[in-house]
Amino acid sequence: MKLDEIVAWYQKRIGTYDKQEWEKTVEQRILDGFNSVNLKNTKLKTELIDVDLVRGSTFPKAKPKQSLLTVIRLAILRYVLLPLYAQWWVKQTTPNAFGFILVLYLTQLTNWAIYVLHSSRIVPLDYEKPPNGTLLQAEADGDASDKDADKESEEHAALLSALLIPCALSLLISLIHSQIVATNTASGVSGGSSKNKLRRISASYLSDKAATRENRVRRRKKIVRVRQVEADLSQASSNISLPNRRTATSTIEVLPRPVTPLPSPTVTCATVPDPTTPTTPSPSVIRRSTNEETYLTTTAISPLTQPLAAIDACYDLSRKAGGAAPESPKKRNVNWHTPIQIYATYELGEEPCSSRKVAEESAPESVGERLCSVKPDYQTRRNIGEDDGFESLNGKSSSGEDNNHSPLPNAVAVAAPPAPVQTNQLRLRLNTTNGVTASASPTEKKPQSRGNESSTSCAESDECDDADIMSSPASGCNQECTTSATDWLGVTTNSEDCSYTSDLDHSDGGLKHTAFSDEDPGELDITPTTILNPHSSLDRISCTIWDQRDAKKAQLSVLEIASCIIERVDSMGEANDYIYIGVVFSFLLTLIPIFCRLCEVTLGSDAEKASEISYFNMPQLLWEKSSASLFTLLGLAFGDSQWERMVLALGFVQRLCLTLILFIIFAVAERTFKQRFLYAKLFSHLTSSRRARKSNLPHFRLNKVRNIKTWLSVRSYLKKRGPQRSVDIIVSAAFIVTLLLLAFLSVEWLKDSAHLHTHLTLEALIWSITIGIFLLRFMTLGQKIQHKYRSVSVLITEQINLYLQIEQKPKKKDELMVSNSVLKLAADLLKELETPFKLSGLSANPYLFTTIKVVILSALSGVLSEVLGFKLKLHKIKIK
C-alpha cells in the first residue's frame, strides 16, 4: 500500500537524524549477522514457570488474522451482496440458518422495491387558496394543510424506520459474526484442492524465477565454511594446495541433486545408522542457512582416515560449475583463536555436497534423537541492504533478491524430491534415548534409500498419520518424513520427549507471510506443555478424592484436575432465563411502532385533549374507535393503503426475527459468562476440604511448591477455557450500541421540540434499557469471576495452615517455610497482575466510580438540604 510505504519511508528518514556513529556500526553488525555462533541441542526446563502462567498467556487463544477495517468492509459486502457470499455463510453457519437469513434478505429487497414504487404517493400535496375566500378561511385552510403535511411526514418517517431499522440490525449481526470468524480466513475449498492449487502456483512461480535467472547480470555466491577442531587435521588440510585437493581420490559418492518444482519447507528426519554396521568416524555437519550465506560448520569428532575425501567432495561442486576456488578465505568474522577454516564457493545453481550427502556416524548410545525443521520462504519486503536482524531464523534475504534465485534445500539428507507443502514454521523434535543429531554414513546407502522411498510415497499420498509418528518416534524417524504443517495442529503428546515449537515467535508487527501460508506461524510456538504432559510424574500432585464417605489419595495432573471441574460444570443444568428474557424483549421492541401508531390514532391531533386523557383509558377508547372489530384495529395499526400495510407488515416480521437473533447472541454471551463464573467458583473449592467434598472435586493443600505450581496452572487454564474473544466482541458490540443510543437520546432531549415523544425516541429508550440489562449482567458476572480468581483469602488461609503444620511437625520447618515464602510471592504476583474487569476495553476504574458516587451524593444532599430545611453532610466516603 502506498500510504504504508510513505509512513515507513518517513519513519526511516527521521530515524537517521538521531543516530550516532556507534549506533550505525552496531546496526551494520546486526545486518551482517552473527554467523560464528555455535548452536547446540538443548532441552527446555518445563518444570519452571513463567509470568505468562499467572497472567494466562500460557494458554493462548486464536487471534484475528484481519484488521478491523478489513472486517468492517467484508461485513458490509457480506450483507449487501449476501447471495454472492452464500458459500461463506453456509460454511460459517448452517444451510438452514443461511436459508433463513436469505429469506429475510429477500423480504428486505421486496420492501424497498414496494416503497420506491409508491413513495411518490406520500409526498405532501400543495394546497391552493380559493380565489374568492375570506382571510379567515384561508388561514384555516393553511392550518389544515400544515397538519396534513405533518401527518404525511410522520407517516413517511414511520415507513422509513420500518425499512432502515431491519437493515441496521442485519448489518450489526453481519459485523458481529464477521469479527468473530476473523480468526478463520481459510477458503472454503478442501485440503486436496488447496494443495493442487498450491502446486499449480508453485509451478508458475518456478517458471517465472527461471526466466529472471537467465537475465540476471550478477550471480550471487554462497560461502561454505568448513571448521575443523583437530589441530593435526587443520594443519594437514592447510598444507595441501587446492589443485591437489581437487585431484584427490574421493571415496564419498555425491548423490545427484533432486529436481524440485519449488523450494518448499519440508519436515526431514535424518536416517538412523544401524548400530551393527561397522562405522568410520567422520565429522559432524551442522548446516546454518542465512539470506546471504550458507555455512556448513564441520567439527571433527575423531581423527579421520580419509580427511581429504570429504574436502574433495566439497570442492567438487566448484569444479562442476567450472569456477575456481578462492585463493584466500574471506576475512570477515575471523576468529584467530579457532582452528583454521577452509572456504569454498559455489554458484547458485549448485548445491553443496554436504547438503546432498552427509558423512556422519554416531555411537550406538547416541542414536535416537532427530531434528525435523521446516523453514519457510518469505516474500521480499525490504530493499537491498535492509534487514531486520532475523535473517538466520526466517530465511528472508537481506539483499532483496529472494525473487531472483532459488534457495538451497533445507534438508540434511535428501535423496528423493519432496512434494510441495504449505508454508509454515514448525520444529519437531523426536527423542528416544539421548540427544545428538545423526545422519547416514556413506556405507549405509541401502537403508537410506529405503527410507527415502517410503517417505516419498508418504509425501505423494498425503496420508501420513501424525499419530503414528508421535507414537513411534524411533521407527518414524528412520525415514524422511514430508508432511504439511497444518497436519501438526492439534497434536497432543503424552511424554516429555515429544514436543514441537516454532522457529520464530511472531508478534503483531512481524514479517508478512507468503501467499501460500494458511496458518499463522506464531500459533505453533505457543503449545502449553503443562497441559500436554499429563503422564509426567513431575507434574502430578497428591490429591484427596472422596468415594462416597471414604477419602482416598490419588496422583493427579493439571489436566485431570481441570477436567474434573469442567465435567462438574457440564453436568449442571443450564438456566434459560435470559433466553426467555431476550424473546420477551424482542416482542416488546417489535410492538413499539404499532403501539405508537395506535396511540396517535386514539388521541388524535388535539394536544389539549391528549393531555386530559389518561393512559389507562386508552385501550377502551381504542376499542370503541375500532368499532369492536379486530380487522379495523389491524388496519389502524398497519396503515390505510394496501402497500403501506405490506411495508409495515414485512417490517414487523423482519424486526421480530432480527431482534430475536440479536438477543439470542446476547444470551449466548451471558451463558458463557455464567460458565466462566462456575469454573471460578469450583476452582475456589479445590483448597477447601468441605467445599471440595460437597462439589465432588479433588482436594489438595498448597503446602508444597509443586502444589502451588499446579494450582496456578489450573487457574490459568480455567480462565482461558471456553470462548474468549468472540464473547468479548459480543459484549463490546452491545456496549457500543448502547452508547450510540444514549447519544441519540441526549441529542433528542436537548431539542426544544414538541416531537419529543415520537416512536423513534421511545424505541431508542427501550433498546437502551433492554441492552443495558444484559450489560449489567455481564458486568456483575465479570466482577464475580475476578473476585473468585483473585484468591487472596485462599493464599492467606494456606499460609495459616503452613504455620499450623510447622507447629505440629517441627522437623519439616525448613520445607514448610519455603512453601510459605512461595505463597507470599504468589499472593504478591497475583496482586501485581490483577486487572479489573474490562467492558469493551474500558475497565471499571474504582477511582472513577468513587468520584461519580461522591458527585451524585453531593448533588442529592444539596437537593435534600433545600427540601428538608437543614444541611446534610456526607461522611466516610473513602477511595479504595
Curated annotation (Swiss-Prot):
The modification Phosphothreonine is found at T527. The chain crosses the membrane at residues 68-88, 97-117, 156-176, 575-595, 646-666, 727-747, 756-776, 848-868. Residues 256-286, 357-412, 434-464 are annotated as: Disordered. One of its GO terms (cellular component) is endoplasmic reticulum membrane. Pfam families: PHTF1-2_N (PF12129). Residues 4-185 form the PHTF domain. The modification Phosphoserine is found at S517. The keyword Ribosomal protein does not apply. The keyword Phosphoprotein applies. It is found in: Membrane. It is a multi-pass membrane protein. Glycans are attached at N132, N239, N431, N452. Coiled coil: none annotated. Residues 394-407, 449-459 have a biased composition (Polar residues). Residues 265-274 have a biased composition (Low complexity). PANTHER family: PROTEIN PHTF (PTHR12680:SF6), PUTATIVE HOMEODOMAIN TRANSCRIPTION FACTOR PHTF (PTHR12680). This is Protein phtf. The lineage of its organism: Eukaryota, Metazoa, Ecdysozoa, Arthropoda, Hexapoda.
